[in-house]
């Protein structure tokens, strides 16, 4: 199962409605009952439109395809919008969930996605093309995806910062 998961991690599953879909992890789970063990599968996926929208979903089922399908449907329902700046983020941000923490910084055009594991899949589906990211602490895929989405939710545009400070955008950059 670990070999199958390693091959499947971060692979595009196949969009039908213009959304980008990535499967991040598949785990075999066991429920112990009086008569023995019941085996099942849990899937973690992310879905994005390539233009700033992203959603995360989890699904469980007795079979892998059904678990992946449930996860994709949940990810579509949980989509949120992130503002991007020329294929990157506006400023350095940090996010945390559980013991997983991530740091992201904007990168100039042509840098590419410098990130590993589940973070790379999130950036690819959201439409980020240039970013530098580093994860610290836990490498649990579920917590890393949540920490990544938490960090992206803290990204503010210059107009949002100016409005909050009661200044104009020009006054921010003086």
Swiss-Prot record:
GO terms for cellular component: small ribosomal subunit. One of its GO terms (molecular function) is structural constituent of ribosome. Residues 19-82 form the S5 DRBM domain. Signal peptide: none annotated. Keywords: Ribonucleoprotein, Ribosomal protein, RNA-binding, rRNA-binding. Gene3D superfamilies: 3.30.160.20, 3.30.230.10. GO terms for biological process: translation. It holds the Pfam family Ribosomal_S5. SUPFAM superfamilies: dsRNA-binding domain-like, Ribosomal protein S5 domain 2-like. NCBIfam families: rpsE_bact. Part of the 30S ribosomal subunit. Contacts proteins S4 and S8. The N-terminal domain interacts with the head of the 30S subunit; the C-terminal domain interacts with the body and contacts protein S4. The interaction surface between S4 and S5 is involved in control of translational fidelity. Belongs to the universal ribosomal protein uS5 family. With S4 and S12 plays an important role in translational accuracy. Located at the back of the 30S subunit body where it stabilizes the conformation of the head with respect to the body. This is Small ribosomal subunit protein uS5.
